[in-house]
Design a protein with these regions (language model features):
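Conserved N-terminal beta1-alpha1 strand-loop-helix module at the mouth
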Residues: 1-91, 97-111, 116-124
């Protein structure tokens, strides 16, 4: 299945003076059509509540919403996929869990990382 991967990604961050919701709204207003929610500081319950808010903003703007690392939440929220920053993640197990319809991306820091992910054929994009 061919998936659309935007060329303009915005990654939210845990910032002291700007919430993920504010960052998402500003990014969408600026033309971003791919939002990667990168929150590493909240409980699953807090994440789910915030993801619902982000999904509403993304839906309003026609933007794709990708979660960083929290693939276990995909069946509880309206997000289109997950991005794994752990180069050693079990991409086969993650792909099996999330299914073929969800987007799966992975971070790469070396050419070896890129080769391993590409050879496995399980990720939709490498960043």
């Amino acid at each position: 299945m061919k998936k659309y991967i935007s060329k303009f990604h915005y990654l939210t961050q845990d910032l002291p003076n700007r919430s993920h919701v504010e960052q998402t709204r500003i990014a969408c207003e600026a033309g971003a059509n791919w939002i990667q929610y990168r929150c590493l500081s909240k409980t699953d319950e807090e994440l789910i509540a915030e993801i619902h808010e982000l999904a509403a903003i993304c839906d309003d703007w026609g933007a794709t919403l990708i979660l960083t690392k929290h693939f276990h939440l995909l069946d509880q929220v309206d997000a289109q996929g997950v991005h794994m920053e752990d180069m050693k993640a079990d991409f086969k197990a993650i792909r099996n869990q999330i299914g073929a319809d969800k987007t799966l991306g992975g971070s790469a820091n070396t050419f070896e990382d890129i080769g391993r992910m590409d050879q496995a054929g399980l990720v939709d994009y490498i960043g």
